[in-house]
Amino acid sequence: MPSTTLSTVLSDINEFVVKQGHGVKGLSELGLQTLPNQYVHPPEERLSSMDVVSDDSIPVIDVSNWEDPKVAKLICDAAEKRGFFQIVNHGIPLEMLEKAKAATYRFFREPAEEKKKYSKENCPTSHVRYSTSFLPQIEKALEWKDHLSMFYVSDEEAAQYWPPSCRDDALEYLKSCEMVSRKLLEALMQGLNVNEIDDAKESLLMGSRRININYYPKCPNPDLTVGVGRHSDISTLTLLLQDDIGGLYVRKLEHEAWSHVPPVKGALVINIGDALQIMSNGRYKSIEHRVLANETNDRISVPVFVNPKPNDIVGPLPEVLASGEKPVYKPVLYSDYAKHFYRKAHNGKDTIAFARIE
């Protein structure tokens, strides 16, 4: 692209990246030598190598025998002590994982004109959203990331509204995660003295699901920006499929230090969300995490968010409080909690205060 055109693009980043649908991927492909100012984050929001603990590791749990009490204990221990862990031998074939990643590339390689059909301004449903950064309309500094979010309502709605380039493989993968989510939650509920997941509990724990496909293009100055800023998820659980590039960092519990989550072939990264931290009255931990940009490789990831239904009331479970434990959180309408999260830029774990009893 001629330098004059590049200058024009840089003079109105929002027009090119957001309105025209090129995303940050399109910006990266212009051959940038330096990072545009709109993506430069303040030093306190960048991750220094001094803050990274290299000898720390996230647990990797073999769940080939879901019924083994030792497996359930490992899952509960990881949820209490780390909030993040990886699982292997989970039952989803490697071929299906690869198809989900391939579907991600197919969508993001579509022309901008095709991708922008799914933007907030153009898509006929709010359940599908192509966007860049997190909340570009209010963020002081943008994140170096594009994403497509698909909220699952029904197969019929997915057939009508999800992008054809990724729809079938994304839907198949989302459904395959349902069994894994259920097995994880059965184990986690045992640790909270919940012996059975009845219909009401099922709605509360996993009543709604959303799949995102994320694209992090290579960046000219990765040390000046972020792929995703510090935040915790508001889900019950998040199941993340990552590629082999790396870049996900997790905050150590009660520390300022951060640990890298190394890619493990065939693994899923599991993290506890705010909803489950609230339901467990703080026993299970929803931990801050972030994604770094990198200079040499494009990176993709596919998170599946398992959530309560929007009209569910989320609070400490009765079984958790049955022994007389004092509630740390008040009951909140899940849709209100989600609205609180989406009204501001990523800012650590601030959202949990919305439900905390002062």
Curated annotation (Swiss-Prot):
Catalytic activity: (E)-4-coumaroyl-CoA + 2-oxoglutarate + O2 = (E)-2,4-dihydroxycinnamoyl-CoA + succinate + CO2; (E)-feruloyl-CoA + 2-oxoglutarate + O2 = (E)-6-hydroxyferuloyl-CoA + succinate + CO2
Binding site for Fe cation: H231, D233, H289
EC number: 1.14.11.61, 1.14.11.62
Induction section of the entry: Transiently induced by fungal (F.oxysporum f.sp. batatas O-17) and chitosan treatments, in association with the accumulation of umbelliferone and its glucoside (skimmin) in the tubers.
Pathway the protein takes part in: Phenylpropanoid metabolism
Positions of the Fe2OG dioxygenase domain: 207-308
Residue sites binding 2-oxoglutarate per the record: Y216, R299, S301
Keywords from the UniProt entry: Dioxygenase, Iron, Metal-binding, Oxidoreductase
GO MF annotations in UniProt: 2-oxoglutarate-dependent dioxygenase activity; 4-coumaroyl 2'-hydroxylase activity; metal ion binding
GO biological process, alphabetically ordered: coumarin biosynthetic process; phenylpropanoid biosynthetic process; response to fungus; response to molecule of fungal origin
Cited function: 2-oxoglutarate (OG)- and Fe(II)-dependent dioxygenase (2OGD) involved in scopoletin and umbelliferone biosynthesis. Converts feruloyl CoA into 6'-hydroxyferuloyl CoA, and p-coumaroyl CoA into 2,4-dihydroxycinnamoyl-CoA, but has no activity with caffeoyl-CoA.
Identification of the protein by name: Bi-functional coumaroyl CoA and feruloyl CoA ortho-hydroxylase F6H2-1-1
Species in which this protein is naturally found: Ipomoea batatas
